Amino acid sequence: MGQTLTRRDVLRTGAASAGATLLLGRSLSEATAAAEQQVGSFRYCLNTALLRGYRLGILEQVELAGGAGYDGIEPWIADVQKYAASGGSLPDLKRRIADRGLVVESAIGFAPWIVEDAGERAKGLEQARREMELVSQIGGKRIAAPPAGAVEGPAIPLSAVAERYRALLEAGAAIGVVAQLEVWGFAKNVSRVSEAAYAAIEAGHPDACLLLDVYHLYKGGSGYQGLRQLSRQAVRVMHMNDYPAIPRERIEDKDRVLPGEGVAPLSEVLSTLRANGCATALSIEIFNEGYWKKYDAKTLTALGLERMRRAVAGLR
């Protein structure tokens, strides 16, 4: 059975990993890479969506994530852009993230790389390149690639989705950032794991992978049994949350709750990822106004981590 070995554990103990002994003093990037190779392991990440209601800047988000004890952070591109536009230094932001013991596990962007119109798609691909460059400059190696721009409208053939995803992966490979094909359960396109898996396989690119979300698996009707078919390389980041007993046809993004406060089969999801051998960053993603009214930012940040750890600790 796999274990939950975080990057912090690696740095602190010099634990054996992936067939090699990790020694204290090795670089943060080396320790992170080793943690990512731990079969059936989990790391803990703050998707800054959890804090959006507080309207904090990226530096405040980093401080909260580091102070709470997360292993990584998943910022929104818009927040990084706002920081840079106001005169902030990206190299300095990269250092601050590392100084707080964090890695940039992923980033949230909405480039319309998938759309049908060729001209708009070219613009979307160029936007994605700019955003991936930004991610690279702050030390990140992954970015979300949701079906932005194709939420409504006609269904796009999966062969075309695969072709467009490959183009996105090739753009990312030149930069050193992997685009993760994200499932949006409410969208007309790429709303199910099976659709995303087909496109990722058909893309025929070694970096192809999926970005999944507990809520979106339910919303899109994917279910959870299909996760057993995914390889250990398929899911490098998983958006963690829970949801109440609302029919999937009516449930919305804002209804997501903290792990353990809903009815999602979290043990099944996490056990499957572990059995598959995935080394996955669990990234808490919730947009619940009720929490923003009930808790201050520091408390909610800590709760997100505590609830994810509790979910993993409950696995057999």
Which residues does each PLM region occupy?
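Active-site-proximal loop/turn and secondary-structure-junction residues that shape catalytic pockets
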Residues: L50-R52, I77-D79, F110-A111, P147-V151, ...
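Histidine-acidic metal/acid-base catalytic patches
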Residues: G2-C45, L50-A68, V190-L212, H216-R316
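Active-site acidic/histidine proton-transfer and metal-coordination neighborhood
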Residues: G14-G25, E36-V39, V62, R96-R100, ...
